[in-house]
Amino acid sequence: MTMASDGERLTGLWFDGQKYYPEAGLPACEAQALPLFDQTRAWLDRYFAGENPGPVPPLRLEGSPFRLAVWRLLQQIPRGEVVTYKAIARQLERKRGGGRVSAQAVGGAVGHNPVSIVVPCHRVVGCDGSLTGYAGGVERKAALLRLEGVECRAGAVPEKIV
């Protein structure tokens, strides 16, 4: 994985070969020794050990107001749970006081999340429970969900938990 920072806050966390990985223009990257990177590595170690990793490292997310709103909602999805793109769209509609928001627009914002795992975009699934649209790959999405105790089989989670 590659981490990026503004020196104080995490601005990016990507799997190698991930879709939308920024090829240029990264601020401080892992090559620099930053306490934040040590903190993030420790958080990830706890996460991958199957533990509750605790509070997330400090973040600085940059994007359109719509993307930022989606990413804030992603941060509210509890470990071990999934939410549909459509449910997030409906939450945004309520917060805005009306006006349609499409699940596809939510999917676009989710897919461009610059801080994988920490901002848990892997916890968002299709309305039928399908594991679609993960920039890190569907197999990786399934592995992350299983690590959190979510039942996954045949590229989907059971509809009863969606």
Residues of each region from the PLM?
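Compact structured core domains
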Residues: 4-56
